[in-house]
Amino acid sequence: MTEKVKKLSPRRRARECAVQTLYSWAISKNAPEEIELNFIVDQDNEMKGVDMPYFRKLFRQTVDHVEIVDSIMAPYLDRDNVELDPIECAILRLAVYELKFELDVPYKVVINEAIEVAKVFGAEESHKYINGVLDKIAPALSRK
């Protein structure tokens, strides 16, 4: 019996790449332009099927708005931002950016995508934590 392989949408792939670059940026503290370029070069073969303009927008705009994003997240976290698992922080930052600034993307899509990305990159229970936090943030941003 063959296992059915689900093809990921270009936007899902863009979100996955944005989370990876946000993680690298947070860990390394290198310039965002350097992180993005190195990621694209390193992942050359993996970049097929990625909505590149959306990936670049998500990464760059999340970095540009990180103070706003972090201030939105802070009241809904059970610990300080710096104590979050770095990958969870990257997923939350991306999702909060989308909830706040990408108003053409339905909030349910943003939350679902964050959960799915957490299942790929996060710890075993990360997706539940991500869901709980975003479920509280969305109404606060008038997205529910």
From Swiss-Prot:
Name of the featured protein: Transcription antitermination protein NusB
One cellular-component annotation, GO: cytosol
Native source species: Histophilus somni (strain 129Pt)
Biological processes, Gene Ontology terms: DNA-templated transcription termination; transcription antitermination
Family assignment from sequence similarity: Belongs to the NusB family.
Record-linked InterPro entries: NusB-like_sf, NusB_fam, NusB_RsmB_TIM44
Keyword line: RNA-binding, Transcription, Transcription antitermination, Transcription regulation
Gene Ontology molecular function, alphabetical: RNA binding
